[in-house]
Amino acid sequence: MENNKFNETVEKITRLILTSPQKMIREEDLINLSEDFNFDDIIGNVYLNLKNSGFEFIISKFLDQKYYVLTIEGKDDNITPSQYGTLALIAALAKEIDENMKITDLKEIFSEVWSSDVEFLIQNEYLRELKDLGLIKVTPLGKAVLKNIIEDLQLKNLLDVFKNK
């Protein structure tokens, strides 16, 4: 009986993740959905279900909270190459200056692509505008989109690419 309830909980969480319009979910919410079962056991089984269905489920930290992000292999077709490049540059800048990027500075740096790229990235939750603090941060979804290159993402390397062109 206990095993059936465990499997039902795993199935319920997996279904919720797959059908949710949001591509990310807070760890705290997943813990609450896990009922009285061990969270690590539940999330491990959810991860296997998603992996067996061709998805990836990665962990990212944002504003001192852990998020789980549902992704698939390859690039997101909703994002243009220019938007990918803009997001990569912003992520590299964030890494260099400890993630606190002023909106005013970014508007100046990305003035040519602000309305086409940066606003799209904000509207689609790849970037979050913290208006009260005057900052922009890369969201877990934005980090997930760049997951295959984020470890090597350094501002110096990106600038070298553009310098060599």
Regions from the language model: what does each represent?
Residues 60-74, 128-154:
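Accessory beta->alpha helical hairpin/"wing" motif in late/C-terminal subdomains of nucleic-acid enzymes
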Residues 37-46, 108-124:
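Short amphipathic alpha-helical interaction segments
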Residues 1-65:
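Eukaryotic partner-binding/assembly regions in large regulatory complexes
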Residues 10-28, 79-108:
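Short amphipathic alpha-helical interface segments
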Residues 1-13, 62-91:
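Short alpha-helical segments that sit at the start of domains
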Residues 4, 111-112, 132:
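Intrinsic disorder
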Residues 73-90, 142-165:
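Short, amphipathic alpha-helical interaction segments positioned at domain boundaries
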Residues 102-109, 119, 133-134:
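Short, surface-exposed recognition loops or helix-turn segments adjacent to catalytic cores
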